[in-house]
């Protein structure tokens, strides 16, 4: 089976009244996404629920949604996450004799060694296929804290530390967590990492890079955790300078390579896997780089296509 999983930082979604919900719904449906992980969700997902109820469901798609509590401090950096999935494809795990116990998504703030590390702890969901295949998807939604732009060095070090905890602690623990039915588990982390994958052609003012491959061992077995998606995903500021850390090309409207996917090819052996940024500004907004950041987001979505 093939699945398309999207990640989309919607930039203060639920807090900004100017969001074009029709256009956001058009993007989600037009890209045929089976699951979408959202970052920067405010108001306990009120805007996301409205998107589901008024702009997606009436188009004959069946979707479900879960929104996290807002985490962070109360000084404007507190935000939540959300998941939206096609209920024709996936469902939440159930247990109990009557299937009356459901594994609900949760904020990961109670794992040993991770408490207090994340400014905004990741949001974790398990999904089972509705038809075919004895497996489950385990998805980790994260928005690494950007930090105070006045203190670039410490802010970047914090981002890199949060990323290190994601790939060295959170991902392996979630990936190896046993559940009663012993389904094959396929685990993917995704979101806005606020860090770029290092490439020689990327000129990054602040050196906000991540390590693309992390190696770890369990007993005699060795594993890799790989972070993917090299395309630029954040839009330049209107004057193409602003506070972006990437050196934008004069011909480019994009600034940073911040949105990624992370998985282990050994423990999540997909038959096929690929990912890319979606050029939604050109495809859905007529190339209008003034309209898009004002009404949609300062990020474009990314998608990972997997075959199991």
Language-model-derived ranges and their functions:
Residues 19-24, 30-31, 36, 120-233:
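Extracytoplasmic, non-cytosolic globular domains
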Residues 98-105, 143-147, 276-285:
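Short, solvent-exposed aromatic-acidic interface loops
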Residues 1-81, 113, 164, 256, ...:
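N-terminal, active-site-proximal structural segment of metallo-dependent hydrolase catalytic domains
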Residues 8-11, 38-42, 66-72, 84-87, ...:
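Active-site-proximal beta-strand/loop segments in catalytic clefts of secreted hydrolases
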Residues 2-15, 96-97, 136-146:
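Active-site-proximal beta-strand elements of phosphoester/diester hydrolases
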Residues 44-45, 172-188, 194-308:
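Metal-dependent phosphoester-hydrolase catalytic domains
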Residues 13-22, 29, 39, 44, ...:
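Extracytoplasmic low-complexity repetitive segments enriched in small/polar residues
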Residues 42-136:
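Structured beta-strand-rich core segments of catalytic domains in phosphoester-bond hydrolases
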